[in-house]
Structure formats: C-alpha cells, structure tokens
Amino acid sequence: MNDKNNSRETEQNLILGKNPVMEALKADQPIDTIYLAGSGTIFSKIASMAKNNGVVVKNVNDQKLRQMCGTATHQGVVAVCACAEYATVEDILERAEEKGHAPFIIICDEIEDPHNLGAIIRTAEAAGADGIIIPKRRSASLNQTVHKTSAGAASWIPVARVSNLASVIDELKEKNIWIYGIDAEGADYTTVDLNGGIAFVIGSEGFGMGKLIKEKCDFLLSLPMYGHVNSLNASVAAGIFMYEAVRQRNK
C-alpha cells in the first residue's frame, strides 16, 4: 500500500458514556484518565476495570464533566484517551488473513455526520467486517460522538483514515477485492455474489458517492424502494448490505 495512505496517525479523544468506556477498557485501548460522577454497581465496575488496566480514576462532580463535554450526554463517565489511533489499510487486510477469510471492508465516502459513522461502525463490527476506511477530508473523525454512537464498537474494529481514497480503491482492486458502491442507479443487491474479497462504498446522505469514487466501483448496488420515500439513512442502508454479505458468506 502507498505509504502516504498507510501510515498510522493519532488524535486526542474523549469517550463518553458507561458502555463505550467499558468497551474501551475491555479492548485495552490506551486511556489516560477516567472521570466518574456517580456511584453504584456500574461505576464500581468501571473503577475496578480501570485499576486493573493501570488507568487513573478521578471522582468528580457533574459540573466538571459538563465543562469537559459541553452539552454531550456523558452518563457520569468520561475517559480521556492518550489518543485515538487510526489503523492502516494493511492492518485491515492482515486482520482478514488472520481470521482466515477473504477481506470484508467498509469504505465511507464523505460521511460527515458522526452519528451515521458511529452507527456504521457499530453494524460493521457486529457483522464481522475486517475494518473501515474513511478519507481525511470531508469525513467525521473518531471523535466522542462516533465512539458513543458506536456503543463501544469503535474500540474493536480498525478504522483507517487515508489521504487519497481513490488510490486506495485501486490498490484494493489489485488485491482482487471487488468494490461495490451503494447507489440508487445500481442493480438489485440480492442479485450479486458477495463471496470473495469485497468492499462496500457508502456515500453521504443526499449526495451519495463522489463522482470519481463512483467511477472506481466495479459494481453499483441498490435497495428496492416500495414506499413513497426514495432513500434510506446511510447507516441503515449500509447495515442491509452488510448483512446480505454475511448471509451469503456464511452459507
């Protein structure tokens, strides 16, 4: 893979909420400090897990957490990570090899809404995808909203952030990975064979994939629409495609 597209980078990050923080601890994600504003079984469990991981725990009041998070919902639990480390595309391919199956990758093109990105990550992890690829520009990053919306899944699945999505797609094709773009003009998604190495490309709501990325796709796939609306939320559509791949690949 191109070195520019395949170098690890880090980003300061907060993880908010009980379940996302617990999942980050289970995944041994690097955390500097956990701030707790509450008591009870869950808070005690988080404190114990943090201690076992060598993470500093500070008991604070709710006002302190509001100062840290603004208006975001924190449930009385905030983890300050040393960094949010992005994977490389090679990491994702190696993960597929270690799992003993053909690569199953999700590419997000211009998904700027962190709630959508978080929901896509959550579904991708649940569906057993090997990783997510996002562009550096015009994309949500692995921020606190993404972590919270993913319900902790962002701690378990590698996310690569690349400078040139089009060139990465070319490199994936060279590795015999078929690129399937989700697009209203595509063929019925149930008519294609999703075995083998695959990557789904999910574009932004309203605009879809960029012109160049769309042209790079080997196939375009669509969902049949029988009602009055002509599109679905990006994360909902992505979930349907992912689980069709799961169904076919686990026959």
Where are the regions a protein language model picked out?
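RNA substrate-binding interface of SAM-dependent RNA methyltransferases
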Residues: E23-P30, T41, S48, E94-A187, ...
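Structured adenosyl-cofactor binding patch, chiefly the S-adenosyl-L-methionine
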Residues: M22, A27, Q144, K148-A153, ...
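Short basic, glycine-rich beta-strand/loop surfaces that mediate nucleic-acid
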Residues: M68-A82, S150-A153, P158, V162, ...
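Short glycine/serine/threonine-rich phosphate/pyrophosphate-binding segments
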Residues: H115-A119, M209, A238
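Active-site/ligand-binding-proximal alpha/beta "capping" segment
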Residues: Y180-N233
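N-terminal positively charged helical leader segments and presequences
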Residues: M1-R95
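Short beta->alpha connector loops at strand-helix junctions that form conserved
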Residues: N61, A82, D109, P135-K136, ...
